[in-house]
């Protein structure tokens, strides 16, 4: 696919712009490591590891006037901190998150309060079993992922 074909692909599918790095690479017909995506906040280009982390965190690409941006690791941490400080709503401990939401822990979406990673079921169950806090921030639930929990010496 040459440059003109890539541009026409994005123009003809305006309602279906890629939302992940993997989808972007596939749409452009290039390897993932050849994607060059700037951070929406600092403007630095994400390195290969950050591109992979972006998709693992289940974050979505940001499109403005058909220009794509993402969020680098440092800006994810800064964004998580800002949102926590500005939009904090409440805290519940462990399994009390199920009482607060009326849903099973298996059905509740939780992101890391530090890095914005999407917590998997093992991480959520670990927080529940240890009675760790879940925080409601900007309408969504936050906990601590397996990597960030080491910041608290909680292993």
UniProtKB/Swiss-Prot annotation:
A zinc finger (unnamed) spans 39-75, 112-148. Gene3D superfamilies: E6 early regulatory protein. Coiled coil: none annotated. InterPro entries: E6, E6_sf. Keywords: Activator, DNA-binding, Early protein, Host cytoplasm, Host nucleus, Host-virus interaction, Inhibition of host innate immune response by virus, Metal-binding, Modulation of host cell apoptosis by virus, Transcription, Transcription regulation, Viral immunoevasion, Zinc, Zinc-finger. GO terms for cellular component: host cell cytoplasm; host cell nucleus. One of its GO terms (molecular function) is zinc ion binding. It is found in: Host cytoplasm; Host nucleus. Signal peptide: none annotated. The keyword Membrane does not apply. GO terms for biological process: DNA-templated transcription; regulation of DNA-templated transcription; symbiont-mediated perturbation of host apoptosis; symbiont-mediated perturbation of host ubiquitin-like protein modification; symbiont-mediated suppression of host innate immune response; symbiont-mediated suppression of host type I interferon-mediated signaling pathway. Plays a major role in the induction and maintenance of cellular transformation. E6 associates with host UBE3A/E6-AP ubiquitin-protein ligase and modulates its activity. Protects host keratinocytes from apoptosis by mediating the degradation of host BAK1. May also inhibit host immune response. Forms homodimers. Interacts with ubiquitin-protein ligase UBE3A/E6-AP; this interaction stimulates UBE3A ubiquitin activity. Interacts with host BAK1. HAMAP family: HPV_E6 (MF_04006). Belongs to the papillomaviridae E6 protein family. This is Protein E6. It comes from Human papillomavirus type 8. The lineage of its organism: Viruses, Monodnaviria, Shotokuvirae, Cossaviricota, Papovaviricetes.
